[in-house]
Amino acid sequence: MSVLGRRGAGLAARGPTLAPLATASYLIRSFSALNRPPPKYPGHVPLTFLERGALAVGSAVGSLMNPRRADLIAALGEATATPYFIYRLRDAMLSDATGRRILRDRPRITSETLKLPYLRTLPENSVGRTYATWLDREGVSPDTRDSVKYIDDEECAYAMQRYRECHDFYHAVTGLPIFVEGELALKAFEFLNTLIPMTGLSIFAFVRLKPAERERFFSLHLPWAVRSGLASKELINVYWEEILEKDVDELRKELGIERPPDLREIRKLMRQQQKREKERLEGKS
């Protein structure tokens, strides 16, 4: 008799009620734990089809409720990128000479590898200075990106990691801030540039915008995202570490990126207008 057969027989001997439940529980544990394939790289967490689906649904709902949960957004990105989309991203790198070098070199973007104090000394309109200035203004760090763990193919996992770590460069080059309205504009742009499903799904967070913000998103920044996302080159193939001293305006032109309307300036002008209107109404009373 097999081990499973002996286990089932033993449980059956304990009673007719407990035996089916205990045997089913054992089978589930055996399927989900013992039959799961081994990790393929350090930190890899293999998932079954059902587990991946549950992760996608759970992280989608959670990130919609709280768009600031970077861990849920990262999990959603990995769960929905498989099987097709992450291979498309990896193949886009393989089809480009610079992309192939990035896959071969496997550079990582951190505050140490980029030497942020040095970037702050570069010319004002350089890519590196623009990036460092954006980080300082938004109060964020390149060291906070989660490591990829739910993508099975090791090379594809690096492609996703590279996209994740380059995200702040996309912010810096476009000038978009990190509050929800800015993130949605950038995610729409990224979706048309990378086709990563998570970036497209993130757009549904527009329901959390105020009416004025929602109108601005659909009238200004979504059209910008469509134009630039469709016209721009594959950003995954940009070797950012090698162009830090390049003029950022020249880079935008080479990549085909149109700079979007300045969200911070727009919000500032609207606050000033609201303040003047409030003072005018108070003066009448």
Swiss-Prot record:
Pathway: Cofactor biosynthesis; ubiquinone biosynthesis. Its EC number is 4.1.1.130. Residues 1-31 form a transit peptide. It catalyses: a 4-hydroxy-3-methoxy-5-(all-trans-polyprenyl)benzoate + H(+) = a 2-methoxy-6-(all-trans-polyprenyl)phenol + CO2. Pfam families: Coq4. InterPro entries: Coq4 (IPR007715), Coq4_euk (IPR027540). Its main location: mitochondrion. Component of a multi-subunit COQ enzyme complex, composed of at least coq3, coq4, coq5, coq6, coq7 and coq9. This is Ubiquinone biosynthesis protein coq4, mitochondrial.
